[in-house]
UniProtKB/Swiss-Prot annotation:
Domain notes: Has a conserved RxLR motif that acts to carry the protein into the host cell cytoplasm. Lacks the 'so-called' EER motif, which is found closely behind the RxLR motif in most of RxLR effector family members, but the presence of an EER motif is not always essential for the translocation of every RxLR effector into host cells, or for inducing a hypersensitive response.
Source superkingdom: Eukaryota
Protein name per UniProt: Secreted RxLR effector protein 64
Membrane topology: Single-pass membrane protein
Motif (RxLR): 48-51
Gene Ontology cellular component list: extracellular region; host cell cytoplasm; host cell nucleus; membrane
Leader sequence segment: 1-23
Length: 101
């Protein structure tokens, strides 16, 4: 079964994750901490939207999630990076996503 196409929102989320990347990749596991409640809510929505096994999301604290692509990032993200500041300006309040939780 094919995954739905990536939406603009999901592309911003994943680009933000790359920009926020810290630590060393281990094999095909890449960890990115998203440390705001708003980003966590958007990531949760995007994970349901994507509906594939390309991304695993789980909580690693009360206010952030760990984004862990299974595939190497170049295969997961075949589009240009955008500045994190642009993504942050586009983020909606956490309450906007509460009905998805």
């Amino acid at each position: 079964m094919m995954s739905p196409p990536m939406t603009t929102t999901l592309m911003f989320i994943l680009n933000y994750a790359i920009i926020s990347f810290h630590g060393q990749p281990s094999g095909i596991s890449w960890g990115n901490h998203i440390e705001t409640a708003e980003a966590a809510a958007i990531l949760a929505m995007a994970n349901r939207e994507l509906r594939s096994r390309e991304l695993l999301l789980w909580t690693s604290g009360s206010t952030h999630l760990l984004l862990q692509p299974i595939l190497p990032l170049p295969l997961c993200l075949p589009f240009p990076l955008v500045p994190a500041s642009i993504f942050k300006k586009m983020m909606l309040p956490l309450s906007a996503f509460s009905f998805w939780m």
